[in-house]
Design a protein with these regions (language model features):
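Short, highly charged C-terminal tails/helix-capping segments
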Residues: 157-200
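Surface-exposed amphipathic alpha-helical segments
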Residues: 30, 123-169
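Signature of long, low-cysteine stretches enriched in small and polar/charged residues
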Residues: 72-116
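Short amphipathic alpha-helical segments
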Residues: 64-72, 136-140
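Acidic-leaning, charged glycine-interspersed low-complexity segments
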Residues: 82-101, 152-174
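N-terminal membrane-targeting/anchoring modules of bacterial envelope and secretion proteins
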Residues: 1-12
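Canonical SH2 domain fold
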Residues: 33-34, 45-48, 57-59, 95-97, ...
Length: 215
């Protein structure tokens, strides 16, 4: 994993949280934040926090013939003099230092190519460290990321376009889903090379894992 929706051994989705383009596994104790575009109310991505670590997840369109992670990785290295490439559990990964208030911290950017899609994860906190010398939090979030299922859909999208997502559908005891509301943030990301920004948690809902509005 991560998995394509049509893979023969795709995980059982009955306990997954459904965002349309991506289905994420439920993990006890996570906080889940949903980002939306202000004007269209379109879901842009999600961030999962577990203890002192987080991972931001977004899915992007790719050509039929080849993946895009190698060129995205090259662009990241070219555009950020402090970035470095490392070998990690997801293959070639990028360690990118970012400034947070008055200090600099590392983020770990991973990309996985699938059929006409690329899934990007940006790990921060303890899980941003070398994934081959992983902490317990990194091991858990690496496994969580690898269990994500991507549903690219058939709509035409240009390479690096974000694959549209929908509002969350939360599994209950059966296959019947619930739903959680989420907030908005101004502006639409430019794609996998855009700058990651800290978002402010506004509201926490109570169903399932912790869902939060971000603006």
């Amino acid at each position: 994993g991560p998995w394509n929706i049509s893979d023969e051994k795709v995980p059982d989705l009955s306990t997954y949280i459904d965002f349309g383009a991506i289905r994420i596994p439920y993990l006890q104790g996570i906080e889940l934040r949903v980002k939306k575009q202000r004007e269209s109310n379109q879901v842009l991505g999600i961030t999962v926090t577990y203890r002192s670590s987080s991972v931001e997840v977004e899915a992007f369109a790719a050509p039929k013939t080849e993946g895009i992670w190698s060129e995205v990785r090259a662009d990241l290295l070219k555009g950020n003099s402090d970035a470095r490439e490392v070998n990690g559990v997801f293959g070639k990964e990028i360690i990118l230092p970012v400034k947070v208030e008055d200090k600099t911290v590392d983020t770990r950017i991973v990309g996985v190519d699938g059929p006409r899609w690329m899934l990007r994860g940006v790990f921060s906190g303890v899980a941003a460290g070398d994934s081959k010398k992983a902490s317990d939090e990194a091991v858990l979030l690496n496994k969580w990321f690898s269990d994500i299922v991507v549903d690219r859909g058939s709509e035409p999208l240009a390479p690096r376009d974000m694959i549209p997502m929908h509002d969350v559908s939360v599994p209950r005891d059966s296959d019947n889903g619930g739903s959680g509301d989420s907030g908005e943030i101004p502006g639409r990301p430019k794609g996998p090379l855009g700058a990651d920004q800290q978002v402010e948690v506004k509201t926490t809902l109570t169903r399932g894992p912790m869902f939060s509005e971000v603006r």
